[in-house]
């Protein structure tokens, strides 16, 4: 899902060269932006970018790094704006879940305070499906299908056990405190009331 989003974003940016010159991807997310480890996607062919749509994983890497508060860690934000200025970055798209949306917001706040004109956009992607005001986050549909299929197959396996076997099956799924993935297991039922 994250590669499909990157593909769509890069392809759309290429359709508007008057607005967006180059698209840089931060290697391993915000860490790449902070360390100026940027991937210039303009060096990739249209065909290679199109292949992202069906490439699993995250082609540009990822991280679980939450920006600290602006008040306590202003230097990291100033560094980020310096990188944006050095590469004439006018749009900042950040793909991910809750922490990524928080990062996009924090970057927009410091850019405004520092007078740097950058449009910051949080691009939702989370299997947890727990972003406010978002009905279904990209990523959730894939995991919902996978979990429902897995629970149905496990159910068939448990049902095939002999009468003298213990028929208990426990499946732990991701989703933090949201419960959407657990609820998706209900899609495995074949009959009303199961």
Task: Enumerate the predicted regions with their spans.
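N-terminal phosphate-binding or glycine-rich loops at protein starts, especially the Walker A/P-loop
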Residues: 2-37
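Short glycine/serine/threonine-rich phosphate/pyrophosphate-binding segments
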Residues: 2-9, 33-34, 76-78, 98-106, ...
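A generic structural signal for alpha->beta connector loops
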Residues: 20, 56, 117-118
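Short, ordered loop/turn segments at secondary-structure junctions
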Residues: 25-31, 64-65, 97-98, 106, ...
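Glycine-rich phosphate/pyrophosphate-binding loop at beta-loop-alpha junctions
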Residues: 33-35, 128, 138, 193-194
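Glycine-rich oxoanion-binding loops at beta->alpha junctions
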Residues: 35-90, 99-100, 138-139, 145, ...
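Accessory alpha-helical/coil subdomains and C-terminal extensions
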Residues: 83, 94-96, 102-117, 121, ...
């Amino acid at each position: 899902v994250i590669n499909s989003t990157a593909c769509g974003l890069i392809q759309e940016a290429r359709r508007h060269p008057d607005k967006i010159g180059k698209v840089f991807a931060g290697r391993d997310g915000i860490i790449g932006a902070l360390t100026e480890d940027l991937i210039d996607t303009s060096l990739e062919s249209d065909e290679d970018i199109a292949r992202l749509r069906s490439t699993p994983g995250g082609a540009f890497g990822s991280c679980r790094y939450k920006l600290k508060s602006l008040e306590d860690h202003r230097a990291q934000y100033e560094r980020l704006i310096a990188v944006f200025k050095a590469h004439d970055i006018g749009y900042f798209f950040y793909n991910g879940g809750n922490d990524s949306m928080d990062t996009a917001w924090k970057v927009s706040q410091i850019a405004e305070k520092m007078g740097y004109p950058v449009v910051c956009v949080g691009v939702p992607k989370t299997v947890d499906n727990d972003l406010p005001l978002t009905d279904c986050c990209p990523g959730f549909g894939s995991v919902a299908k996978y979990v429902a299929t897995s629970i149905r197959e496990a159910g068939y396996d448990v049902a095939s056990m002999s009468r003298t076997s213990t028929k208990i099956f426990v499946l732990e799924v991701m989703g933090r405190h949201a419960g959407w993935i657990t609820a998706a297991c209900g899609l495995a039922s074949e009959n009303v009331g199961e």
